[in-house]
Structure formats: structure tokens, C-alpha cells
């Protein structure tokens, strides 16, 4: 049975034509000076508090804005159309979030997305999809909207929704991140989907073969013990990587393995904001340690694993948008191992990162007009 439309779908859909950015600071130790950036930056256009971007097979770009707008952009950025205006809960870290075209978009025209909403018990994140259709006026609109899955339980508060989406390499299932909503303990609660990586069918049901269902966990759970998971992506060998914000210190990049416990809130390489200690990850503690972590934090936003030809030296590496660090971060991935690479200061909070069809790297800033720019990085 579909989820109740009244409880989970945006109540306003009009098909038609965050956070404030931090002030720029000095580069942190270890950052690459601006003069050493190995790419050119081209400002394509700007948005109002954008959250995610994704490329369609025809090279057009879909961008979500926090307030609920989903925008379709021509590759050169000169033509834009709002294909949906969704009623979402925008308080705090909420709003319209991730967007990813379906693996079979060329035939199905489906676009998957996530958003926060109010419901029984509080608020939560929802996975939904729609179909891109001709609007009869020379443009497009998102139609046939349906909610597929909602986090359990809904709780009070406006933070740590997560809501990132990644399709499995075979295109038969998807992975969806649920943050622990700043409540700590749900990350270790087997019945909650909060603080988890979930594996779902394309219709939002628990995917067959999930590793913890027989152990009393919610049937959607793939891994648990997570905090605020704002990036998830597969590498070329089918390994699933995830990055998440730590507390005061301890931002992480994790290799996601089925059934593993990643420790939060019982283990972290950071501390609580009030200064209380959290046990560090340690051998034999029963928790899967991060492959890379940061102290001080970078505040990781979106995650992309590079496969293009424009920057051949970076093939297979992970790229992370830094929010409080106002940077683009590269992580060198080598099989199941990872190590820190470059960190380039960008002068603004970077919310999301994606790869264009020609191998260019695209970024969106986290902020309002002229501080929510879409930027294309090309080789020098």
C-alpha cells in the first residue's frame, strides 16, 4: 500500500515555467593555496539556497532549492524552468533535498528526490519520485508524484535529516540515508530507521536480502550507528562509500559494509559540543572505524566519486563539498583504503558536488542569491 498522501506528499505542487553562508576565512593548514588550484572556475548561474544537483542523460541539470523548487537547467545555464514547487518543511536543516534520475530515466523519465515534512509525532525525511513530462507549452513538468518511503519514527526537531540517494550499480535497488535527527540513541535502535543506511527496492519497499532483518532490525536497514549522512556514492568496483558529519570533530568517510555498526553515538573521533568526551574508535570495540576522519571538521556536504577523463589523475577519487570549511576536498580511494588528498579553499560553503558528462566537476554553493552559485571546474 502506498503511504498516505496527506501524511507524506507535499500538499502543493505547481508545474510551471539553509543555511546562511559562513564568512570566508583564511585557508587552514594543509589546504592548497588558491594559486595552486589545478582547475578553472566558471560561474554558470545562481540559485536561492540550492541543495543538490544531478545530470540527466541529455546533459540538462536538475537542481533542488531548499524552499521546495525543483529547477531544470540547460547545460549552458541560460535556460531554466521550475518543473515543480513542493510544499516542504523548511525549518532548520529541512527542505527539498537530494535529487537523482532513475537508472532507466531514458525510458521511464522518473526522478527520485527527498524532502522533510511534518507528520504524526513530529518531522521526518521522505523518499519520493515523479515523472518528467511535456507540459504542453514547450517545457516540462514533474508529474505523477508519489511518496515511496518515510523515516521511522518522526520526531521533533529540525536537524540531521540526511536524505541522500544512491542507486545500486545494477539499477535494481537504491540506498537512502536517514540521519539520527540529533537524538543520538536512534542510531543504535534496531527498530528505528534513523541513523542508518537503508537499502530499498525502486518502489521504496525493503530490498530482499538485507543483512539485519533476521536479527530483529527494521527490514530496510543495511548499516547502522550513523550520525548525519550527507553523501553516499558507489565507486567503479561497486563499493559503497559514505561521508557524515561528526560532532565537534570527527567528520568521517566510511566504506559501507552490510550489517556493520559504525558506532555513533558510542564511538566517534570527535567530542560532544559541550566538551564531553566520546570514546574514540579503537580496535576490538565492535564498531567499524572510518577510513578517513577530520579534526578540525570540514563539515562534509555532497559526495561524488570521479570517473571522468578531464582530470585523469583523479579517476576513482572521492570529492566532498566542505560547508564550514568552505572548501572542495579530495580523498584518494585505493581499493578498500582511503587517505586525505587535496583541500582547495573555495570562499563559500559547498553544498553539493557532481560530475558533468564531459568530466568537468560541478559545485553548488550553500546560500542565497550570488552565494548559491552553480560553478563548473575545468582543467587548466
Predicted regions and their residues:
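Bacterial N-terminal signal peptides
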Residues: 4-15
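Acidic, Gly/Ser/Thr-rich repeat motifs that build Ca2+-stabilized beta-propeller blades
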Residues: 16-184, 231, 239-242, 246, ...
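Blade/loop signatures of beta-propeller domains
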Residues: 20-40, 136-142, 205-214, 266-286
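Short, conserved, GDST-rich strand-edge loop motifs in beta-rich repeat architectures
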Residues: 117, 176-194, 250-256
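Beta-propeller blade signature
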Residues: 125-135, 190-203, 256-257
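Repeat-solenoid scaffold signature
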Residues: 217-252, 257
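Conserved blade-ending motifs and adjacent loop-strand segments that build the rim/top face
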Residues: 226, 337-357
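Aromatic-anchored helix/helix-loop segment that forms the rim or "lid"
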Residues: 282-297, 301
Amino acid at each position: 500500500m502506498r503511504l498516505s498522501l496527506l501524511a507524506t506528499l507535499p500538499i502543493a505542487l505547481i508545474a510551471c515555467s539553509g543555511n546562511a553562508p559562513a564568512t570566508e576565512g583564511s585557508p587552514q593548514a594543509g589546504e592548497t593555496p588558491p594559486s595552486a588550484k589545478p582547475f578553472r572556475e566558471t560561474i554558470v548561474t545562481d540559485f536561492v539556497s540550492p541543495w543538490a544537483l544531478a545530470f540527466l542523460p541529455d546533459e540538462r541539470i536538475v537542481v533542488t532549492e531548499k524552499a521546495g523548487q525543483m529547477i531544470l537547467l540547460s547545460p549552458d545555464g541560460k535556460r531554466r524552468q521550475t518543473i515543480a514547487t513542493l510544499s516542504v518543511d523548511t525549518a532548520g536543516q529541512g527542505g527539498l533535498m537530494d535529487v537523482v534520475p532513475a537508472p532507466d530515466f531514458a525510458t521511464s523519465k522518473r526522478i527520485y528526490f527527498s524532502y522533510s515534512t511534518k507528520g504524526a509525532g513530529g518531522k521526518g525525511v521522505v523518499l519520493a519520485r515523479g515523472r518528467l513530462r511535456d507540459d504542453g507549452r514547450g517545457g516540462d513538468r514533474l508529474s505523477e508524484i508519489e511518496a515511496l518511503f518515510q523515516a521511522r519514527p518522526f520526531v521533533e526537531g529540525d536537524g540531521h535529516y540526511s536524505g541522500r540517494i544512491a542507486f545500486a550499480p545494477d539499477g535494481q535497488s537504491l540506498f537512502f540515508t536517514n540521519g539520527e535527527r540529533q537524538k543520538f540513541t536512534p542510531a543504535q535502535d534496531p527498530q528505528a530507521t534513523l541513523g542508518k543506511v537503508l537499502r530499498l527496492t525502486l518502489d521504496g519497499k525493503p530490498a530482499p536480502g538485507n543483512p539485519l532483518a533476521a536479527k530483529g532490525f527494521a527490514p530496510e536497514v543495511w548499516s547502522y550507528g550513523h550520525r548525519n549522512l550527507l553523501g553516499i556514492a558507489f565507486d567503479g568496483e561497486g563499493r559503497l562509500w559514505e561521508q557524515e558529519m561528526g560532532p565537534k570533530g570527527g567528520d568521517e568517510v566510511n566504506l559501507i559494509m552490510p550489517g556493520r555498526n559504525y558506532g555513533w553515538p558510542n564511538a566517534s573521533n570527535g567530542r560532544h559540543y559541550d566538551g564531553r568526551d566520546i570514546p574514540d574508535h579503537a580496535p576490538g570495540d565492535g564498531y567499524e572505524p572510518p577510513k578517513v576522519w577530520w579534526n578540525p571538521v570540514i563539515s562534509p556536504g555532497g559526495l561524488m566519486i570521479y570517473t571522468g577523463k578531464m582530470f585523469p589523475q583523479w579517476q576513482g577519487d572521492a570529492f566532498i563539498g566542505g560547508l564550514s570549511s568552505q572548501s572542495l576536498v579530495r580523498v584518494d580511494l585505493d581499493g578498500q583504503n582511503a587517505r586525505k588528498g587535496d583541500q582547495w579553499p573555495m570562499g563559500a560553503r559547498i553544498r553539493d558536488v557532481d560530475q558533468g558528462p564531459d568530466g568537468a566537476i560541478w559545485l553548488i554553493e550553500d546560500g542565497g542569491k550570488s552565494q548559491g552559485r552553480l560553478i563548473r571546474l575545468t582543467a587548466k
